[in-house]
Structure formats: structure tokens, C-alpha cells
């Protein structure tokens, strides 16, 4: 269950150093940018960390307290909004608990197919990052010092207008991302996440994952449990009812699943398209009219959604990509039998 998306559905993310410093850099300085990104992914999933994360888009900013705990092969995290409402997400394994103090409600469910951690920082990239030099260029440079830590800055530059660019400031010792910028075609920053303070302790007590507010008297709801996803790594396992007939270069169908929506007569189909770095989720839902949920573009930070009606079905494509990408995918969706499998399955 992705609480960011589910929350929306309920009406509710020293610049240069001298040669003497360079001589003191670890051997990782010679690594390729792609290797650093792979280390970053490992750090986010396997390190203990706690800190204050600031998410900014436009003139808006949200601040949250993030705790990530690893115990053997198990991981858990707690994300608490540092505002007057104090909404909270607690993930233990695949179980996600969303606490809404303002609504006196707790929603318990499972992580959506392809979803990573609950933190907006972890959700920037797919679970299995794949690199393709046809669509991105990668570079590494000194990133200076952030929150007292020396960093490398990794630049991921898109080669066309269908995807965003990224700048990643990674801790040189651990590859932990301390700052992330998502940039548009004109290089303007559409979203930024950064730690204003962070610690990486050897251990974090289990009590740190306890809800910060009492849920006594709250209404508890258990959301629908997603079916096990089918992935396009096994073509014979993929039987989607819908497919995109036109895709931006490099995007392929990665995941397909369906789930029963509360109050709905038919299951909602969920398709995930990705180029290995950027991802677009497509939701196809029956029984919803255009008047209930307007067609067109909606935005939240770097995320762009495009909604269209298709033969009585509501189609919504959403992802941290330019609008033209979500619009292309949403508008080209067709019944699966009308679209050749080879168009969107990875070779």
C-alpha cells in the first residue's frame, strides 16, 4: 500500500576541494556514477538511520521525522509529519500502517506492487534500478559537505523530454543520499528532498518504531490486500487486461496486478511502466465517471498525473515524469488483445 497515493484517493513526499583533500578520498572516488547509485539503493534498504527530512516543491515544504531500522533481514520504518496534524506511516516488512490523527483513523494494508519504503526518499527510484546510457547520461563530481558529511554529487541527465533529471548528493562513507533534486527539461528544480540532520547509528531500538500518538478510540480499517504481482520478467505470467499502445522510448511494462477497490464492483488493474529509473503507475478502474473525477492533468511536486475516460473506464497514469509521458501512456491504453506483447515487454 502506497500511503501517498492512497492518501490522495482519500482526499487527503565547499563546492570544490584542493588536491590535498583529493588525496584523502577513499577508493570509491574512482567508482562509476552507476556504482554509486547502486550503493545508494543498498544504503537506503540496509542502513540504520534517523533524521529530519525536508521535502520541497515550489513554495511548499513539508518536514518529516524518518526512522529506518534494520534487524537481520527485516526492516521497518516510521515516517512522522512534523506539522499540527502529525500523520504517521509505520512500515514493518510489507505491512503498512497509516495513522490519521485528524480523522481518528488507522488504515492497515500491504505495500503496493513495486513499492519500496514508506519514505519519499526511497520512493524516488524503482526497487530494481536499471541503467541505460541511451536515455540518461551519468556524471560524478564533488558535492561539498552536507550535514557535516563529505559528499559526491551524482548527476543523472535525461537524453530526451520524456523523463526528469536527478542530482544526488551521497555521503562518501556510506552512499546514503543526503540530498536529492529532481529537475525538469529546463534544469529547474521541480522537487527537492534533503536531510537537515541525520544520524546513522549501529543500532536503533525497536521502540523507535512505536506510533508517536495514542490510537485509543480510533477507527481501524484494513484495506484490500493486493494480489501477488506478475512481473514482465516472465512473459507467460503476464495477463493484463490493458496495455499502452504507445510508450516513450525505453519504457517497458514491469508489473501487473489487480485489486478489489472498496465499494467497487470490478477490480482495479494496476500497471507499472519503467525505463529502469523513472516509473509510471497506471490505474484502470470501472464504474467511475468523468464527472466524479475530472479528466486532465493534476500535479503534486514532481509527480504528474493524467486522467482520461476510456470506454467506460477511468484511466489514471501517475509518476515523477513530465506530463507528456503520463499523457502519452494514459491516452494510448487499449485492451490487451489489441496491443502486440512485443511492444512493451523487455527483450
Walk through the language-model features, giving the residues of each.
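A short, surface-exposed interaction/processing loop segment used at functional sites
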Residues: 183-192, 196, 294-318
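Acidic/charged, solvent-exposed loop-and-adjacent secondary-structure segments enriched in E/D, K/R, S/T
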Residues: 100-123
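Short, solvent-exposed recognition patches
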Residues: 219-311, 323-328
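Pro/Ala/Gly-rich low-complexity, hydrophilic intrinsically disordered segments
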Residues: 194, 202-233
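N-terminal mature ectodomain segment of secretory-pathway/periplasmic proteins
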Residues: 30-104, 134-172, 176-183
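Bacterial N-terminal signal peptides that target proteins for export
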Residues: 2-15
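N-terminal signal peptide c-region/cleavage motif recognized by signal peptidases
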Residues: 24-26
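Surface-exposed amphipathic alpha-helical segments
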Residues: 174-176, 187-206, 316-347
